[in-house]
């Protein structure tokens, strides 16, 4: 992952970030197999939030063709379409990030904190959503990890008038990283169990 990140920084595809704090033994919440590794979320992908083009500038929205996701669009599944569109002018002038197919999205503000999705189309997002382009990581493993830890993110955001988490809090979150083949096996088992649960609900 570190080599892949260094390569992308060199190619100017992602920005160089400040080094995240080393993980101490006291921080580790539980034991993991020897073949796994504790990392921070910021180490396993390129994370970034979006922006909202000024609503008063109609040329940012009228006849727009670029999907612009708001956190209400997050569906705990795959995003195939969103209601709002923005223009190429908005994309070039408003610090928006293009999310690629397969990127993992998480809501950071208000009642939607911790809600997740996977981008099934190329899109942009507002500032209330943080997107991750995974590096040498199975995106569905990250998706299910974030989904399982929704309550953790909600607790992180507690305390203000409107609860919110920041990109900084997300990238510093601990993440148990198994080998890639094992990530695929874990996801396969999760989806097998989810299918079984849905069948039982129908009985």
Question: At which residue positions do the language-model features occur?
Answer:
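Non-catalytic DNA-recognition/assembly elements of restriction-modification systems
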Residues: 24-51, 180-188, 195-203
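Specificity-determining recognition surfaces
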Residues: 148-173
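Short, well-ordered beta-strand elements within core beta-sheets of diverse protein domains
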Residues: 27-32, 130-134, 171-177
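A short beta-sheet element
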Residues: 70-72, 81-147, 159, 166
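Low-complexity, Lys/Gly-biased intrinsically disordered segments
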Residues: 23-24, 37-76, 92-94, 112, ...
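Extracellular/lumenal ectodomain signal focusing on beta-strand-rich modules
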Residues: 35, 43, 115, 172-174
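Extended, domain-scale alpha-helical bundle/helix-rich regions
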Residues: 1-20
């Amino acid at each position: 992952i570190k080599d892949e990140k260094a390569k992308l920084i060199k190619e100017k595809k992602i920005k160089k970030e400040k080094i995240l704090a080393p993980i101490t033994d006291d921080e580790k919440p539980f034991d993991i197999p020897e073949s796994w590794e504790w990392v921070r979320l910021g180490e396993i992908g390129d994370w970034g939030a979006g922006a909202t083009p000024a609503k008063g500038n109609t040329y940012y929205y009228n006849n727009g063709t670029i999907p612009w996701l708001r956190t209400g669009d997050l569906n705990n599944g795959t995003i195939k379409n969103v209601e709002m569109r923005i223009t190429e002018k908005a994309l070039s002038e408003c610090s928006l990030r293009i999310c690629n197919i397969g990127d993992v999205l998480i809501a950071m503000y208000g009642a939607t904190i911790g809600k997740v999705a996977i981008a099934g189309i190329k899109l942009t997002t507002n500032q209330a959503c943080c997107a991750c382009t995974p590096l040498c990581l199975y995106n569905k493993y990250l998706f299910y990890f974030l989904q399982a830890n929704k309550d953790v993110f909600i607790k992180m955001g507690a305390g203000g008038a409107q609860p919110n988490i920041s990109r900084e809090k997300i990238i510093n979150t601990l993440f148990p990283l198994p080998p890639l083949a094992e990530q695929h096996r874990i996801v396969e088992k999760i989806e097998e169990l989810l299918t079984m649960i849905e069948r039982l609900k129908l009985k």
